[in-house]
C-alpha cells in the first residue's frame, strides 16, 4: 500500500506578534499559490508579514524536499494563527499605580497542497 502525499506543513511557534495581527496577514494569502503569496507578503506593510512569509517558504521547502512535490504547483490550503503564551509586564504610572501590559505571542501554521492543474 503506497500512499501519495500531496501536502506539507510548517509551524512557527512562539512568534512575538499578536494572533489578531497575524490573522490579518494570513487572510491575505489563504488559498493563493505559494509564488503569489510570497510576492504579496514581500510588499505587505504589516510587521507580521515577514514571519508569515518565513512559514510559507518553509512549508514549500518541506513539500519539495520531504515529499518531492513541485513548488510551482503548491497552493496554501490551510493557514491559521493560534494564540501562544502571553507575557505579562507592568508599566509604572503616576502615584504608585501600575498598568498591565500583555505581550502576546502566536503559533503560525501553514499547510500547502499540490494542485496538479495550477502549473503554468
Swiss-Prot record:
Pfam families: Ribosomal_L22 (PF00237). It comes from the Bacteria. One of its GO terms (biological process) is translation. Signal peptide: none annotated. One of its GO terms (cellular component) is cytosolic large ribosomal subunit. Keywords: Ribonucleoprotein, Ribosomal protein, RNA-binding, rRNA-binding. The keyword Calcium does not apply. PROSITE patterns: RIBOSOMAL_L22. One of its GO terms (molecular function) is rRNA binding. The keyword Ribosomal protein applies. Transmembrane segments: none annotated. Part of the 50S ribosomal subunit. Belongs to the universal ribosomal protein uL22 family. This protein binds specifically to 23S rRNA; its binding is stimulated by other ribosomal proteins, e.g. L4, L17, and L20. It is important during the early stages of 50S assembly. It makes multiple contacts with different domains of the 23S rRNA in the assembled 50S subunit and ribosome. This is Large ribosomal subunit protein uL22. The lineage of its organism: Bacteria, Bacillati, Actinomycetota, Actinomycetes, Mycobacteriales.
